[in-house]
């Protein structure tokens, strides 16, 4: 669990926390706490027989490509792809916000899977415009439209379709 601030709010919201969740607070995985992240990944590799995959859910201000670069440092890890959750109603506004635009655009451009969420909150015309806009930013990314954040688990834990990403059609 990675929170940007001093308080690890997300960790406290996870009701099934069983001691197997690793918390990283007070910074972005790819920036100020990257050493903690590196050590955490090394520790996970040592326990690799306990699980098949590790999913890193980074904060909204993270740089996914830098996280992948960190994971690529260890020869025992094989990073499998960058998934970005897109708010269909807000992403274009966020992409022009002077505080977060660079981060938003970089996340979209490095994605291999764009999960376009909240599609029920935009018109069909807006959705078609958004789809074309995303295609221009990330032409090689797979786009999946959904609402309520509902996606099949196979999208994250599915079969490998190329050297970088696992995906199974629902």
Annotate the PLM regions.
Residues 66-71, 89-104, 108, 114-116, ...:
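Non-catalytic interfacial helical region
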Residues 1-102:
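Nucleotide-state-sensitive switch-loop elements of NTP-binding domains
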Residues 1-2, 115-117:
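Short internal beta-strands
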Residues 58, 117-118:
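Short glycine-centered, acidic/aromatic-flanked micro-motifs in structured strand/loop junctions
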Residues 81, 112-113:
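Well-ordered beta-strand positions
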Residues 106, 110, 121-170:
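C-terminal accessory "lid"/substrate-recognition subdomains
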């Amino acid at each position: 669990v990675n929170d940007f601030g001093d308080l690890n709010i997300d960790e406290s919201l996870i009701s099934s926390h069983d001691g197997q969740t690793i918390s990283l607070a007070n910074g972005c995985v790819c920036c100020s706490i990257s050493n903690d992240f590196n050590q955490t990944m090394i520790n996970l590799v040592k326990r690799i027989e306990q699980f098949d995959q590790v999913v890193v859910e980074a904060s909204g201000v993270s740089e996914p490509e830098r996280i992948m670069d960190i994971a690529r440092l260890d020869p025992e890890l094989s990073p499998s792809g960058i998934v970005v959750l897109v708010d269909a109603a807000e992403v274009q506004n966020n992409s022009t916000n002077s505080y977060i635009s660079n981060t938003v655009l970089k996340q979209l451009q490095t994605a291999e899977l764009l999960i376009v969420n909240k599609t029920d909150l935009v018109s069909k015309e807006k959705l078609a415009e958004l789809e074309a806009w995303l295609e221009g930013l990330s032409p090689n990314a797979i786009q999946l439209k959904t609402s309520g954040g509902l996606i099949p688990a196979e999208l994250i834990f599915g079969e490998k379709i190329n050297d970088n990403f696992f995906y199974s059609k629902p």
